[in-house]
Amino acid sequence: DPCYEVCLQQHGNVKECEEACKHPVEY
């Protein structure tokens, strides 16, 4: 999932990324 990949690269927080990527998110 691109959202998840980008989130992990930028934040490195798996739990946060899982939550964030359930919904449209802007980075």
Swiss-Prot record:
Intrachain S-S bonds: C3-C21, C7-C17
Tissue specificity field: Expressed by the venom gland.
Keywords, sorted A to Z: Disulfide bond, Ion channel impairing toxin, Neurotoxin, Potassium channel impairing toxin, Secreted, Toxin, Voltage-gated potassium channel impairing toxin
Keyword RNA-binding set for record: no
GO molecular function, one term: toxin activity
Function field: OmTx1 decreases the amplitude of the potassium current of the rat channels Kv1.1/KCNA1 by 17% and Kv1.2/KCNA2 by 12% as well as human Kv1.3/KCNA3 by 24%.
Note on domains (UniProt): Has the structural arrangement of two alpha-helices stabilized by disulfide bonds (CSalpha/alpha 2(S-S)).
Name of this chain's protein: Potassium channel toxin kappa-KTx 2.2
Taxonomic lineage from the root: Eukaryota, Metazoa, Ecdysozoa, Arthropoda, Chelicerata
